[in-house]
């Protein structure tokens, strides 16, 4: 059993040492849904959305892979790419903050919830073309798209099986995985099968853009630095051998299963800290002896030290304190600053 520590006690301790600098910097990543919204503005947004797909004071933790966080003032299901863009238009016209939610991986929602409009991206239309192109709305679940592509004999997406993401999230993060067994030496990126995408630019314009605009990097694209939103994506796939693709699916699932906690049993946000070139962030946390260390119901995984899991009733405060503890320990022992990879969404000031 992992060591258990009270979250508030750790936060007080960190405020008195060098780790407080790291902990304080972490909160600057929180820029959306942090401040209460006037009820009249929320009413104005709600009145312009499809009522049947709108919920007020809606829990959003169940729609995240961490299963953590308070409610959203407004939760809206967008069924098409155009519907998604229009919902953003409405929120911005009323000066209400908004956030697009896919499968809810790679984020931590504050215990105070999200002040504004959370849009669940349910846009999932897929158009297949005989030349290997497929045009996919951004809310399509990657697992579903991979399954259908393999069944149809189209290769290029099977490498990314087992990573929880929508298509929009895959482009946002430049989804990646190691090349197939036996070598597993090269990192393969979703950018390799990307042809174009249609976006809503942060100025409201709808336009098609290419890879040069997206600026694919390691865990990085233009979407990290703007409020552009992906509406649909065109992938360029190639004919493949179904048997070979199925083998890759199974091998990749087995490889991940042996190295990552399963979300069904241990909710998590995926990797917590960004990659440090030449030195794995998880390796540094592990070398500090922190596997199994817990604060409240948030625990550093026994399987992978760069993953934190929700043991059942973890709060965002628990996770923040655990992140700060790991940052302080690694900085104290190795002089390395761990930078969170996950996004902080909503109000973290709730008591």
Give residue spans per PLM region:
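Phosphate/pyrophosphate- and phosphate-bearing ligand-binding catalytic cores of soluble enzymes
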Residues: 28-32, 55-56, 62-64, 107, ...
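Compositionally biased, low-complexity flexible segments
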Residues: 1-9, 16-18
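Beta-strand segments within the central parallel beta-sheet cores of soluble alpha/beta enzyme folds
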Residues: 161, 195-196, 341-344
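Anion-binding (especially nucleotide phosphate/pyrophosphate-binding) glycine-rich loop
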Residues: 38-173, 177
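Short polybasic amphipathic segments
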Residues: 126-127, 195-199
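Active-site glycine-rich loop that binds ribose-phosphate moieties when present
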Residues: 173-197, 208-220
């Amino acid at each position: 059993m992992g060591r258990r520590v009270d979250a508030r006690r750790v936060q007080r301790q960190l405020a008195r040492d060098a780790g407080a600098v790291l902990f304080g910097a972490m909160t600057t990543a929180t820029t959306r849904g942090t401040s209460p919204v006037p009820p009249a503005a929320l009413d104005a947004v709600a009145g312009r959305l499809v009522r049947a797909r709108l919920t007020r004071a809606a829990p959003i933790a169940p729609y995240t892979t961490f299963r953590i966080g308070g409610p959203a003032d407004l939760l809206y299901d967008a069924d098409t790419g155009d519907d998604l863009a229009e919902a953003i238009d409405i929120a911005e016209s009323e000066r209400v903050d908004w956030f697009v939610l896919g499968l809810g991986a790679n984020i931590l929602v504050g215990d105070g919830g999200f002040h504004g409009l959370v849009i669940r991206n349910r846009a999932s239309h897929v158009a297949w073309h005989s030349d290997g192109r497929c045009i996919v709305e951004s809310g399509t679940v990657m697992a579903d798209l991979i399954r259908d592509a393999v069944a149809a004999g189209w290769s290029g997406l099977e490498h990314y099986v087992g990573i929880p993401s929508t298509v929009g999230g895959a482009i946002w993060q430049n989804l990646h995985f190691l090349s197939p067994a036996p070598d597993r030496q090269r990192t393969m990126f979703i950018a390799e099968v990307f042809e174009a995408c249609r976006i809503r630019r942060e100025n409201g314009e709808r336009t098609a853009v290419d890879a040069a605009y997206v600026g694919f990097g390691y865990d990085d694209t233009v979407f990290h630095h703007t409020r552009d939103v992906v509406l649909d994506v065109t992938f360029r796939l190639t004919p493949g051998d179904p048997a070979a693709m199925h083998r890759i699916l199974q091998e990749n699932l087995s490889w991940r299963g042996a190295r990552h906690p399963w979300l069904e049993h241990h909710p998590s946000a995926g990797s917590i800290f960004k990659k440090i070139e030449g030195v794995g962030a998880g390796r540094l946390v592990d070398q500090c002896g922190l596997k199994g260390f817990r604060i409240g119901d948030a625990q550093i995984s026994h399987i992978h030290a760069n993953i934190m899991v929700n043991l059942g009733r973890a709060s965002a405060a628990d996770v923040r304190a655990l992140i700060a503890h790991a940052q302080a320990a690694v900085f104290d022992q190795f002089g390395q600053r761990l930078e969170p990879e996950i996004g902080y969404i909503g109000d973290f000031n709730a008591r």
